[in-house]
């Protein structure tokens, strides 16, 4: 079986936080949490009802975390999606003999009015051994990446972006990619938009192939690059088009990106046959594997006739 193919595949809707929240420890009604005006009062906290948990789960703000940030974290799509995942078929609280007792909200990074990144620690215990399961979480949510293959004069090329990646302290060659910035989970629309922003290439929506949709449904039909510490789920897409030699030359070394968002991007075009040796990007290597195996199994949709990539 495969995940359903199609261009309307979206992330499942998240339940409102009100369906999870039972009470706040400070008592009373109103906001999710309420910090006391007394300087010696404990940090903001609340309890949430999580189906599958032994009882109400306490959520606490780390020392120094403002009440406003704590409230935004509790209300964020990132936090609600993580709680939802606990209850899925392979969820920690449904598939294994694990219990969740407390969550410590440690940090919040805002992208404008939206919570972009969330850092928290979950106390999860194996019910049989009573041993704690590593529970440090860097939540960043849903993302997309696109393997762009351009054919020119009998040669197939892949388009990569080169940009500074501060967490690894280096510049990195990788697939054009981006984060989903809303709760609707529009993977295909985001993929097309990110490619245009990062490369200047205008893609035809109907020509996009969702490679991760070819996975078995039990996988969730997304790629998880670092599940030991990060919740990121990536939808990998394929785009195939034909271009002339002048277009390939114009793309090579082209500087792109949204400068106002700190994106300083340079394009690199490499022969597809050398792509697997040209980058250490997990998105690219995963996309290559999916693309090649789908071709081998005969389940890759045929490329659209006469599809031209436009700049």
Label every PLM stretch briefly.
Residues 3-175, 179-193, 200-311:
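N-terminal leader/linker segments that precede catalytic domains of diphosphate-processing enzymes
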